[in-house]
Amino acid sequence: MYGAEVDGGNDSDMEFSNVDCPFMVKVDIDDLNIRKGAGTNTAKTGRYTGKGVFTIIQVKSGSGSTLGWGKLKSGAGWISLDYCVRIN
């Protein structure tokens, strides 16, 4: 299952899953916080993703995100999948 599909828009009934890892997501906002852990209760790294395509290697549930948190392949940290669209 995916959190969202490119041609179908967001579907809040669907979830991202570790079974699908790794997968790519598109971020369309400039200031998506990168966090040190999976949740808004973890510290921000002080960096933002910017708009672009990113590879997610792990998914975890956590506070502040309905669809879960994705760990960036780059090692920069975790992003909320609520602001991502799966592209593959």
Residue positions per predicted region:
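Short alpha-helix capping/helix-loop boundary micro-motifs
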Residues: 38-44
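SH3-family beta-barrel domains
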Residues: 5-33, 46-50, 65, 85-88
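Eukaryotic modular interaction domains in large regulatory/scaffold proteins
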Residues: 34-37, 53-54
